[in-house]
Amino acid sequence: MRFAQRPAMPERRSLPVLSLRDTVLFPGIATPITVGRLKTLRAVEAALRVEGEDKRIFAVAQRDAAEEPTASGLFSIGVIARITQVQRFGSGLQLVLYCERRAAAPRYTEVDGVIRAPVIELADLPLRPEEDGALEALSREVRERAVEYGRHRGAPEDVLKQFVGSMYGPAELVNHIAFYLDLPTPEKQALLEILSTEERMRSLALHLYRQIGIVETQEKIRTTVEEELGERQREIYLREQLRAIQKELGEEDDENAAARLEHKLQRANLPAEILQEARRDLARLRRMGRETSPEAQVLMTWLEWVADLPWSQRTDDHVDLDRARAILDEDHYGLGDVKDRVLEFLAVRKLRLEQARSEGERSRAISRGPILLFLGPPGTGKTSIAESIARALGRKYVRVSLGGARDEADIRGHRRTYVGAMPGRILQGIKRIGSKNPVIVLDEVDKLGASYQGDPGAALLEVLDPAQNDGFVDHYLGLPFDLSEVLFICTANFRETIPPPLFDRMEPALFAGYTEQEKHEIARKYLLPRQRKECGLREEQLRVTGTAIGGIISGYTREAGVRQLERTLGALARKAARRIAAGEIERAVVGADDDVKELLGRARMRLERRLQYDQPGVATGMYYTQMGGDIMHVEASVMPGKGDFVLTGQLGDVMKESGRAALSYARAHAAELGVPSDRLQRRDVHIHVPAGAVPKDGPSAGVTMAVALVSALSGRPVRSDIAMTGEITLRGTVLPIGGIKEKVLGAHRAGIFEILLPADNEADLDDLPAEVRSSLEFYLVNTLDEALARCLRLRSIRLEAPEEMPHARAS
């Protein structure tokens, strides 16, 4: 072998060595390379540290596929490659190399874990004049054989011709074809080491002839085998393959599957008529076989469902009221009214079961109970208290989320004729837990929808009706299934969006939300210990004082429940855990508002607070939403004008009508209120409810609007320490409204301790927690003049009785 040296390269510094497994690179090739081994990564990093664009590396193949390359395990001839692109992924690198020249490494040295080598460029031997003709003939032969080889491999012929035609010189042609040819590493390395272009092309042509012969032989063998296999032999062969595949996948043949299904049906203790129907379909399955009909798989899936449903499996009820009370208290703080209602419900079931003399009477005693509806804001414990009921009864628990359900098939399932048909969610849950008498929570029934696919709310009517659900027929099953022993509990946030026929089947239990004191205790006893555990903290590593918990409740949450409170405590625990894990602190004690602010940032919530002083035209009202109750300041302003009346604040129609009723009342009784009669004619009146981006509606702002309006007209300031609510009529009568508990709790949270309510709402005060009720003073009014006297600090406002309306007389 002859070597030709150029003088330029020996002057180059030694290059880092990139060892390649099962890859030989040739000059003129640009190719991506994935680097992941430690030594190769070090070599690439050493090459990349070179200043400027001279980021070159010596790429050489390994003699074997060893994981840790050594100097003795590398060939001596490789290529000098320039690194053109680098992309990191995970712990490795993706490179694009352009191979510039062939080179030899007389020796390898390893310094600081990087293999380096002084490289000497190896140029191709110069061509002799007599070699030109032979080289041209060889080039044509290599091009033709390369196209033929690629065609056998499945590549398009036009693409192959374009590829080989783009090679300008013999050296470029032989290097590219040798790189892409499927040859063992030693044979490719031998091609790289040949410096004579003619010799290298002759060797490549021999390799191409040999590879083409191998491929043609493989094709002949395949054709001969396919011809020798007749139709019968082919069928036998395929069936044997199918059995082998089924065995590997753990599947059964038809007869074994049918026998297994028959055994399951016998053990399922099915009712007689259902067992008869199942056996009839099982006989059909045996006759058709799985391969002969697409219906066979549908039948098999249906029979699996019939056999797996718990037709007679149930759990025994253990109604122990003391244990039930202990479980409810253990899982939930507060909610006294709800717990009492649940215990009453369980007590009735206990007495009914004790009086039942037969299995039929026992079943009727279980099925005749009411359907409880837990109604209240998010995060107040509706779903979790249903789970506690299941624990108290010793029953299994299933939750079915119906939020956004718009298809009747969610309840009744799809008919078997549809592709991918499945039973409804009710039967899916019952099959999953394996009991016919679980506690099933139908979550978010107020968010059911309806579409062209049916109304799931209408489908629930049968499910929740004790007179019908003992024979509930799912569309997929097509057989009656007894749901009468299931204890259904529904949850919802809004009463108004539940379909009236569905609501009529339920008995609501109201979850009004928690007071700040209740939230404080829930955070201390339940939420904080849970978040400590989830973050891997011991009790002494994270302590949160009562003051800090109160600050979190008021400054970082605004809700009737405790869901956001738990998330905020979780964020607090995670930030403390990070500091402890980093070694910055040994334990965290959150004791003041500054500590909370340091960990959680500034407070995100701004609760409405009572006004600091009395002022005309501003009255404090109360409202409630699904997030709980709060206060609002209704503003009234009187200005020179033409008697126009303006209402702003994105008010609904009902609130606008309340404002107009208040204005009409003020005009009718201007003299008694001390308002000059001409003032209303020469003044414009503007009533505004702040937070204009939030839509508002409802009748309960009538009293507040009237007080603010009369205050603005008369110039008398409204007491800032009193909050009010109630609907008004044109005669000045104050009518009762709803949401008293939530509104009063919101006012109490805002620091207001005097509440004005309609007298007809007096009974609603019994729903208030004792600690809240004892700290407030209530004023119950029947008429608007009583409200004005109380809110404007007047002794009384005496209004004349309205004139009696004339009676209609029959002619």
UniProtKB/Swiss-Prot annotation:
A GO molecular-function annotation: ATP binding
Subcellular locations according to the entry: Cytoplasm
Induction comment: By heat shock.
Catalytic activity: Hydrolysis of proteins in presence of ATP
Leading EC class: hydrolase
Chain sites annotated for binding ATP: 376-383
PROSITE patterns membership: LON_N, LON_PROTEOLYTIC, LON_SER
InterPro entries to which the protein is assigned, alphabetical: AAA+_ATPase (IPR003593), ATPase_AAA_core (IPR003959), Lon_bac (IPR027543), Lon_bac/euk-typ (IPR004815), Lon_lid (IPR054594), Lon_proteolytic (IPR008269), Lon_Prtase (IPR027065), Lon_prtase_N (IPR003111)
GO CC annotation: cytoplasm
Active site: 700, 743
GO terms for biological process, alphabetical: cellular response to heat; protein quality control for misfolded or incompletely synthesized proteins
EC number(s) per entry: 3.4.21.53
SUPFAM superfamilies: P-loop containing nucleoside triphosphate hydrolases (SSF52540), PUA domain-like (SSF88697), Ribosomal protein S5 domain 2-like (SSF54211)
UniProt xrefs under NCBIfam families: lon
Family: Belongs to the peptidase S16 family.
Protein name: Lon protease 1
Native source organism of the sequence: Sorangium cellulosum (strain So ce56)
